[in-house]
Amino acid sequence: MSDQPSTPEPSALEKTQALLASLWQRNLPTLRQRLDTLDQAVAVEPIAPELLNEAIIIAHKLSGSLGLFGHHHATEIARELEHLFRNPSSAAPGRTKFLTQELRTTLALPEAPPTA
């Protein structure tokens, strides 16, 4: 018998939360890169076709993955962005830019500093 107090085993929920937190941290660089690409896409109207296609793919990926990490509002924003990118004529002027900024704010990921 050991004199040391036993440490309780983490619950399944705690293990899952720890795993998700680890995955979130590991994927932050990719997420920031995707947000930067969305920023580039909405910076100039009209969006270049290649950048528009990339923005559609990114918005789709974000709408499918952010909810897993508990970012349900961000999922809705990404879903709306995807719709607007797929149907550019339905976008109110500045709406995609606003939503891209809102997505970044919701995820608490500030814009990357400008590179020289």
Task: Outline where the language-model segments fall.
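Long, amphipathic alpha-helical coiled-coil segments characteristic
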Residues: 13-55, 97-111
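N-terminal assembly/transducer modules of large multi-domain enzymes
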Residues: 24, 28, 65-71, 76, ...
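Short, low-complexity N-terminal regulatory "tails/caps" that precede and couple sensory modules
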Residues: 1-15
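Extended, amphipathic alpha-helices with heptad-repeat/coiled-coil or helix-bundle character
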Residues: 49-87
